[in-house]
């Protein structure tokens, strides 16, 4: 059994895999070492990988190294099953790469657009030759709502949850519809352009996908575990890579 860990800006997710099959998933906003220890003791995985968009405590890294026969902290020097065509690979988010790998292994030899809607929105492209070609980063829903409140004197801070009419009928719905409809049109344009120019298939993932998956058009594959699946593929690749040396 393998354990894969995706520590994002807001939520930490854990996936347990047997081969390529997802057996169980967990998530938390509060990272406690006792919680990790309980999972490791209960399921006794043999190998694991962790990627993080923020600093990881040394105590957690030590626990994982001591508990697993093989442990990899996913950094940009780790061998990958994709080629990277990006001018600053050291600054490239490992979560973006994991999502790209997860999509690639599901739809080999296709051009792929990978959209991850979380705290931030990332839009990445992998071509049919398995080359990651880069992408864009935009503000996620909460960041947009926070920005409207923070950078103005009178606009309230509101939640993503609630009515989203095509035209706001009060200040709250005007803000929410402006943000959420704006994201729909933004992502819809990306999907349409990549389908036309690259004949790309689109993957959607991320914690905020639920707000948009039914409102976007195109050839869409929604996979809430895409990053975890990609990390699992990267972990499997490490074992194959180092055995071949």
Swiss-Prot record:
Pathway: Cofactor biosynthesis; coenzyme A biosynthesis; CoA from (R)-pantothenate: step 1/5
Name the record gives this protein: Type III pantothenate kinase
Single Gene Ontology MF annotation: pantothenate kinase activity
Assembly notes: Homodimer.
Binding positions (substrate): 86, 93-96, 171
Chief site of localization: cytoplasm
A cellular-component GO term for this protein: cytoplasm
Source organism: Azobacteroides pseudotrichonymphae genomovar. CFP2
Matches recorded under PANTHER family: TYPE III PANTOTHENATE KINASE
Needed co-factor(s): NH4(+); K(+)
Biological processes, Gene Ontology terms: coenzyme A biosynthetic process
InterPro entries for the chain: ATPase_NBD, Type_III_PanK
């Amino acid at each position: 059994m393998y354990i894969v860990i995706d520590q994002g800006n807001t939520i930490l997710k854990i996936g347990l895999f047997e081969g390529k099959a997802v057996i169980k998933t967990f998530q938390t906003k509060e990272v406690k070492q006792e919680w990790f220890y309980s999972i490791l003791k209960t399921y006794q995985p043999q190998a694991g990988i962790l990627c993080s968009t923020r600093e990881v405590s040394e105590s957690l890294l030590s626990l994982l190294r001591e508990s697993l026969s093989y442990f990899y902290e996913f950094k940009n020097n780790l061998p990958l099953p994709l080629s990277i065509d990006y001018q600053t690979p050291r600054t490239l988010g490992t979560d973006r790469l994991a999502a790209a790998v997860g999509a690639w292994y599901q739809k080999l030899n296709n051009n792929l657009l990978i959209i991850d809607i979380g705290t931030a929105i990332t839009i990445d492209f992998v071509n049919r030759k398995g080359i990651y070609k880069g992408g864009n980063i935009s503000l996620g829903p909460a960041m947009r709502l926070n920005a409207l409140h923070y950078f103005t004197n009178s606009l309230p801070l509101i939640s993503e949850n609630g009515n989203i009419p095509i035209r706001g009928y009060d200040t709250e719905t005007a803000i929410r519809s402006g943000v959420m409809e704006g994201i729909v049109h933004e992502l819809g344009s990306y999907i349409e352009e990549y389908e036309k120019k690259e004949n790309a298939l689109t993957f959607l993932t991320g914690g905020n996908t639920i707000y948009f998956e039914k409102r976007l058009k195109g050839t869409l594959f929604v996979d809430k575990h895409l990053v975890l699946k990609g990390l699992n593929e990267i972990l499997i690749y490490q074992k194959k890579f180092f055995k071949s040396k």
